[in-house]
Curated annotation (Swiss-Prot):
Organism: Klebsiella oxytoca
Recorded topology in the membrane: Multi-pass membrane protein
Chain ranges passing through the membrane: 14-34, 51-71, 81-101, 103-123, 150-170, 171-191, 224-244, 268-288, 296-316, 317-337, 354-374, 385-405
Family: Belongs to the major facilitator superfamily. Oligosaccharide:H(+) symporter (OHS) (TC 2.A.1.5) family.
Periplasmic side: 35-50, 102, 245-267, 375-384
GO cellular-component term (any): plasma membrane
Site (Proton translocation): R307, H327, E330
Protein name in UniProt: Lactose permease
InterPro entries, alphabetized: LacY/RafB_perm_fam (IPR000576), LacY/RafB_perm_fam_CS (IPR018457), MFS_dom (IPR020846), MFS_trans_sf (IPR036259)
Length: 416
């Protein structure tokens, strides 16, 4: 529905939650892309220790993700979860500067566990809860979720360049900016009125909201061969790629005259890539509708394999910049392809549980195991040799997935 056709309250909610997405993903971008750089340069962690931190974050994401999904479904349009995450984000700078960093330098395991709890709650688990809540608000207030979500891409892209510049001056500046923007999130939550209309409540009562996780549907999935075929792809391709990307920033900045210059360029490339990602995301549903979800996942796997293997042979800054930009082509095919594959290859009632177990939890569980091992490999054989091994793994599993993923001759609507 057009913005002009919305009621005043609905129009206000559209604006409030568009801004909420912008500032939330701005804050997330202050953490995620440059986190391995912060661990290495500020806290002097080895690549093995960095892998341990990532493993802990994934571990606590596994613990909290299902819990927050259930709580989110129970709360509906009430703002309790968003208030909790906003308060925790206000503490972003104090936590990183006065708690997380000293703990990491004093005891790596204590720091990894405490940081894993905080980051696993605020970002790895809660980002899904934020997305689900605002999607629910969009249905209750008759505006399109996708139009609101684009502002998150813009916030992420803008912060990447700012952080790349400020990191060379003082990383703490970015953390304080993030905490300040979290205060704005609080104001936006305070003024928003996301209560649904009567008709929306009826739709909600009829089960239009996403199905909650249940052990019965999980057990039904485990008996399906096509479920395990999908798991093979997620664990062998998508999960390995995520672990590869965790410390790519440290590899990237090594190709420049100084680490500071490398960090700045990494920020600019991330910004350009994120804007390109948003553009491709608009086109991806129509493309995937034409080629099919299985082929979309295979193309994503091929792009991931090319990027990892290409990185193992990269010798110049230009090459790593081009390889970094490939990430923005892979993401739309992976995300949209996953949703379309789930909807075409499985029963509708299984889709939510399948996405939770088959995609999110399996990726996080794989990351718990792989992150520390890959970090250790970086320290022992170096980035190039490790990337060659990881690239061969993803390429092999992409080929295997050609036979284990289920194809579908039925084309889906061109909406993600």
């Amino acid at each position: 529905m057009k913005l002009s056709e919305l009621a005043p309250r609905e129009r206000h909610n559209f604006i409030y939650f568009m801004l909420f997405f912008f500032f939330y993903y701005f804050i997330m971008s202050a953490y995620f892309p440059f986190f391995p750089v912060w661990l290495a340069e500020v806290n002097h962690l080895t690549k093995t220790e960095t892998g341990i931190v990532f493993s802990c974050i994934s571990l606590f994401a596994i613990i909290f993700q299902p819990v927050f999904g259930l709580i989110s479904d129970k709360l509906g349009l009430r703002k309790h979860l968003l208030w909790t995450i906003t308060i925790l984000l206000i503490l972003f700078a104090p936590f990183f500067i006065f708690v997380f960093s000293p703990l990491l330098q004093m005891n790596i395991m204590a720091g990894a566990l405490v940081g894993g709890v905080y980051l696993g709650i605020v970002f790895s688990s809660r980002s899904g809860a934020v997305e689900a809540y605002i999607e629910r608000v969009s249905r209750a207030n008759r505006f399109e979720y996708g139009k609101v979500r684009v502002s998150g891409c813009v916030g992420w892209a803008l912060c990447a360049s700012i952080t790349g510049i400020l990191f060379s001056i003082d990383p703490n500046i970015t953390f304080w900016i993030a905490s300040g923007f979290a205060l704005i999130l609080g104001v936006l939550l305070w003024v928003s009125k996301p209560e649904s209309s009567n008709s929306a409540e009826v739709i909600d009562a009829l089960g239009a909201n996403r199905q909650a996780f249940s052990m019965r549907t999980a057990a039904e999935l485990f008996r399906m061969p096509r479920f395990w075929g999908f798991i093979i792809y997620v664990v062998g391709v998508a999960s390995v790629y995520d672990v590869f990307d965790q410390q790519f920033a440290n590899f990237f900045k090594g190709f420049f005259s100084s680490p500071q210059r490398g960090t700045e360029v990494f920020g600019f490339v991330t910004t350009g890539g994120e804007l390109l990602n948003a553009l491709i995301m608009f086109c991806a549903p129509a493309i995937i509708n034409r080629i099919g979800a299985k082929n979309a996942l295979l193309i994503a796997g091929l792009i991931m394999s090319v990027r990892i293997l290409g990185s193992s042979f990269a010798t110049s800054a230009v090459e790593v910049i081009i390889l970094k930009m490939l990430h923005m082509f892979e993401i739309p095919f992976l995300l949209v392809g996953t949703f379309k594959y789930i909807s075409s290859a499985f029963k509708g009632k299984l889709s939510a549980t399948l996405f939770l177990i088959g995609f999110n939890l399996s990726k996080q569980l794989s990351s718990v195991v792989l992150s520390a091992w890959v970090g250790r490999m970086y320290d022992t054989v170096g980035f190039h040799q490790a990337y060659l091994i990881l690239g061969c793994i993803t390429l092999s599993f992409t080929v295997i997935s050609l036979f284990t993923l289920k194809g579908s001759k039925t084309l889906l609507p061109a909406t993600a």
